[in-house]
From Swiss-Prot:
<dbReference type="GO" id="GO:0043524">
    <property type="term" value="P:negative regulation of neuron apoptotic process"/>
</dbReference>
<dbReference type="GO" id="GO:0031012">
    <property type="term" value="C:extracellular matrix"/>
</dbReference>
<keyword id="KW-0339">Growth factor</keyword>
<comment type="function">
    <text>Transforming growth factor beta-3 proprotein: Precursor of the Latency-associated peptide (LAP) and Transforming growth factor beta-3 (TGF-beta-3) chains, which constitute the regulatory and active subunit of TGF-beta-3, respectively.</text>
</comment>
<dbReference type="GO" id="GO:0050680">
    <property type="term" value="P:negative regulation of epithelial cell proliferation"/>
</dbReference>
<dbReference type="GO" id="GO:0045216">
    <property type="term" value="P:cell-cell junction organization"/>
</dbReference>
<dbReference type="GO" id="GO:0034713">
    <property type="term" value="F:type I transforming growth factor beta receptor binding"/>
</dbReference>
<dbReference type="GO" id="GO:0032967">
    <property type="term" value="P:positive regulation of collagen biosynthetic process"/>
</dbReference>
<dbReference type="InterPro" id="IPR017948">
    <property type="entry name" value="TGFb_CS"/>
</dbReference>
<dbReference type="GO" id="GO:0008284">
    <property type="term" value="P:positive regulation of cell population proliferation"/>
</dbReference>
<dbReference type="GO" id="GO:0060391">
    <property type="term" value="P:positive regulation of SMAD protein signal transduction"/>
</dbReference>
<feature type="glycosylation site" description="N-linked (GlcNAc...) asparagine">
    <location>
        <position position="133"/>
    </location>
</feature>
<dbReference type="GO" id="GO:0008283">
    <property type="term" value="P:cell population proliferation"/>
</dbReference>
<feature type="signal peptide">
    <location>
        <begin position="1"/>
        <end position="23"/>
    </location>
</feature>
<feature type="glycosylation site" description="N-linked (GlcNAc...) asparagine">
    <location>
        <position position="140"/>
    </location>
</feature>
<dbReference type="GO" id="GO:0050431">
    <property type="term" value="F:transforming growth factor beta binding"/>
</dbReference>
<keyword id="KW-0325">Glycoprotein</keyword>
Amino acid sequence: MHLQRALVVLALLNLATISLSLSTCTTLDFGHIKKKRVEAIRGQILSKLRLTSPPEPSVMTHVPYQVLALYNSTRELLEEMHGEREEGCTQETSESEYYAKEIHKFDMIQGLAEHNELAVCPKGITSKVFRFNVSSVEKNGTNLFRAEFRVLRVPNPSSKRTEQRIELFQILRPDEHIAKQRYIGGKNLPTRGTAEWLSFDVTDTVREWLLRRESNLGLEISIHCPCHTFQPNGDILENVHEVMEIKFKGVDNEDDHGRGDLGRLKKQKDHHNPHLILMMIPPHRLDSPGQGSQRKKRALDTNYCFRNLEENCCVRPLYIDFRQDLGWKWVHEPKGYYANFCSGPCPYLRSADTTHSTVLGLYNTLNPEASASPCCVPQDLEPLTILYYVGRTPKVEQLSNMVVKSCKCS
């Protein structure tokens, strides 16, 4: 008897396949979607900043050049990080991804030379040392989320070679006057060509500096095999030292000093100098019960929807203007951004050899009021960088998962 009932239900399911071929999720008109999306974004931004209400608009009308440079550098860095994740097909699953990060920029400082040079290899011809003072954020050191070392490679027209390998090291305290270093990463770079920013992940190194100030002896970029020049067959060329022919802005361009206006002109040049960008999670945004465990993982990115007129589930463009749509004047940059949204029917694909689809269809038939069919939801999201004021204090922060880049049926 039970077997006969099951067969009847499955027969009805086959007849109902066409009617179940589209998602049962409600299709909304664009105006309603935008209204809901705007309200969601309003709540997201305030939540990620741990604000109960929008800050009062600042009386400051001019954004300092250094702050604007930090904002632009952060945007560039996030774009690079997203590109690396695309190439590596990696996913970010940390719960700390959700909350906004405070952005701190530390320019290179001129420090005293440490006793860590090779006896026959003076620094300057085989390597460059970069030192930074990050003591101002030590009290929040355990909440470091990400640290990037950025340096601008500039072309060297007089270079004798077209390419050279460089390696980045963390300088360690010497042991019995023997130089010690910790390898961080390496790159093969052109010596000429156009200028380009180089980025290195130095999160572990900076975290160590923040926890133990005495360990902060700086970073060093060195050529791959210092103090040796190799012939094409691999033999060492005696008494000839390979020198670093890669040039860096702010380190090798000494001709910039002493020329022009020392005020605004110098400030404009400074943002091209070597620097660290630190992303910190403020303590008050952590350890909140009930938060984080419900956050979604990131997924792979796709630009398919912007290249094709897809009627089914896809990401749709939606521009949010902070002033017009949210009524906010406290966000200085950007003026708005493409938040996007997911929309479109999800085809209900069911085949005879798909047990999951059969069970899902059976459940949907027996529970007509339930929504067991897949809905079009965000799959991949990107962060947004904003510049805003709290009183007269400018802040640059990264807000995670604010831009919908792709969708999926789930």
